[in-house]
């Protein structure tokens, strides 16, 4: 669950919370914090504890640990609440909830206008109140989604703040405040080469700048003024941010900021309308800005080796020229529905993520030639029925997942020449077919699909015959009924002589 701490990300906080019960009154035994792991438990975090204590020996001091325990009460309480409320909704669900709330508000305004224009205005206030109450009731579910997302977002910030707080407590305990001040001090290093480049650009137009491997920690704002720049290579530096002024590079075609320490990209990156190649791999990005969708000329986007959990909801609607998308080694749980609109996409690598499936729109990627979905492990269990529509697919890697059955129309992937299905609990097709290779798999799935279609056609024909039989019976019955009605009508219309017996008095 999202509430579980990763010792690698929060080493001190994990250590303190694991030992929290030893500093808690017996009456609080119902706390959500687990007792310290047993040394005999093979899944124990004892190795982590030994490692962190070795690195930070003062953690074992009771006074230090007690101070840290008091500083983690908010984390424990929040974690308990989130465990009750459930996991964080994905980005697309949140976006849809926001959109639905806007639609509801717009509908409410229209309702008020209709009520105000109604001829009977006596009950206007009452009608408006009832409508408002109904709308608020409808909004509860969508608001709860947004609220849950906000709680999880706040919890993640809380964890980071708590970890930093505990580190400060520890450093204060060992009287190492000087190191903290040194780490927090802003260090600006712009070497002579950077200054020289800026001076050269002021005198003569530059179309290419390569500053890779220079250990740069800062990119000067002045770079945004080199308007003739076409290629900017900042690979393998120590950059923590890209200045907003990069939006001034209106003619930029290629931007490489891979292998840095970037945690975010500026929203202004969306103003690079001519950008064709963007490499942001090997950073610390958790999201891509929504504005990246405005880079409509992008042909290649490499966002691999980051901490992304989702892609922008509308990325497929606007990046229609994208041919190559690299998002492997992230933490992406789902792909947006809009990805099906990337009709130019030929290469997609999404291995080593947390994908739990693909949207039905995925089958619209009819130009896709290479697809790697391997190593999504237990999260990826099936593929959409539209998967068979990927008619241009040549290479497919589905290894190391939990797929039990390939889609029925898999046999229609006539251009598929390379297929990896290793480490899947496949039932359809059976293992003996898989071992024979890609052609055997396609043939097996193709025959299976044809058999299914023939069976469906047979059932449809039987149904048509039954319907026809019922129609014939109904026609005959209707004909008989019409004949009977006609005979009765003729009899009544002939006015037979009245029976004298009926005229007798009782």
From Swiss-Prot:
Disruption phenotype: No visible phenotype. Pirl1 and pirl9 double mutant is lethal due to a male-specific transmission failure leading to a severe pollen malformation.
GO BP term, example: pollen development
UniProt keywords, alphabetically: Coiled coil, Leucine-rich repeat, Repeat
Organism of origin: Arabidopsis thaliana
Keyword presence, Coiled coil: yes
Location of region: Disordered: 24-48
Source domain of life: Eukaryota
Tissue: Widely expressed.
Coiled coil start-end: 143-193
Name the UniProt record assigns to this protein: Plant intracellular Ras-group-related LRR protein 1
Keyword Repeat: yes
Pfam families per record: LRR_8
Job of this protein: Leucine-rich repeat protein that likely mediates protein interactions, possibly in the context of signal transduction. PIRL1 acts redundantly with PIRL9 in the differentiation of microspores into pollen.
Family note: Belongs to the SHOC2 family.
Motif residue range(s): GVYW: 437-449
LRR repeats: 203-225, 226-249, 251-272, 273-295, 297-319, 320-342, 344-364, 365-389, 390-412, 414-436
């Amino acid at each position: 669950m999202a509430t579980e701490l990763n010792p690698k990300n929060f080493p001190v906080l994990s250590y303190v919370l694991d030992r929290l019960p030893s500093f808690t009154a017996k009456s609080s035994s119902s706390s959500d914090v687990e007792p310290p792991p047993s040394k005999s438990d093979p899944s124990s975090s004892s190795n982590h504890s030994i490692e962190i204590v070795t690195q930070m020996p003062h953690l074992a001091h009771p006074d230090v640990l007690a101070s840290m325990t008091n500083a983690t009460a908010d984390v424990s309480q929040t974690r308990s609440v989130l465990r009750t409320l459930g996991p964080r909704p994905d980005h697309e669900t949140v976006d849809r909830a926001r959109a639905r709330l806007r639609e509801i508000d717009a509908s409410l305004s229209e309702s008020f206008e209709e009520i105000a224009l109604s001829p009977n205005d006596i009950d206007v206030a009452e009608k408006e109140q009832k409508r408002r109450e109904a709308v608020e009731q409808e909004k509860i579910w969508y608001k709860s989604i947004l609220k849950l997302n906000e709680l999880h977002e706040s919890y993640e910030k809380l964890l980071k703040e708590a970890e930093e707080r505990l580190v400060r407590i520890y450093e204060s305990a060992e009287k190492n405040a000087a190191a903290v001040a040194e780490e927090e001090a802003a260090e600006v290093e712009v070497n002579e080469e950077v200054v020289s480049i800026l001076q050269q650009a002021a005198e003569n137009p530059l179309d290419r700048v390569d500053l890779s491997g220079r250990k740069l920690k800062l990119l000067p704002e002045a770079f945004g003024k080199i308007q003739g720049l076409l290629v900017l290579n900042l690979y393998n530096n120590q950059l923590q941010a890209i200045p907003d002024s990069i939006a001034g590079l209106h003619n930029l075609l290629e931007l490489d900021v891979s292998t840095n320490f970037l945690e975010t990209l500026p929203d202004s990156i969306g103003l690079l309308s001519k950008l064709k190649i963007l490499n942001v791999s090997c950073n610390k990005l958790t999201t891509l800005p929504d504005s990246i969708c405005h880079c409509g000329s992008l042909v290649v986007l490499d966002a691999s080796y980051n901490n992304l959990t989702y892609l922008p909801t509308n990325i497929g609607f606007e990046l229609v020229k994208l041919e190559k998308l690299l998002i492997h080694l992230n933490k992406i749980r789902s792909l947006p529905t809009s990805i099906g609109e990337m009709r130019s996409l030929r290469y997609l690598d999404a291995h080593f993520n947390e994908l739990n499936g693909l949207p039905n729109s995925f089958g619209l990627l009819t130009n896709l030639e290479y697809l790697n979905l391997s190593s999504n492990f237990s999260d990826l269990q099936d593929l959409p029925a539209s998967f068979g529509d990927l008619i241009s697919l040549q290479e497919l890697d589905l290894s190391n997942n939990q797929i039990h059955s390939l889609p029925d129309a898999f046999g229609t992937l006539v251009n598929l020449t390379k297929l990896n299905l290793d480490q899947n609990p496949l039932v359809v097709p059976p293992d003996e077919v898989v071992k024979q290779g890609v052609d055997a798999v396609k043939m097996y799935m193709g025959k299976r699909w044809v058999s299914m279609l023939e069976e469906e056609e047979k059932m449809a024909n039987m149904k048509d015959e039954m319907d026809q039989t019922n129609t014939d019976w109904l026609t005959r019955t209707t004909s008989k009924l019409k004949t009977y009605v006609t005979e009765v009508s003729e009899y009544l219309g002939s006015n037979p002589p009245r029976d004298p017996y009926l005229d007798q008095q009782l």
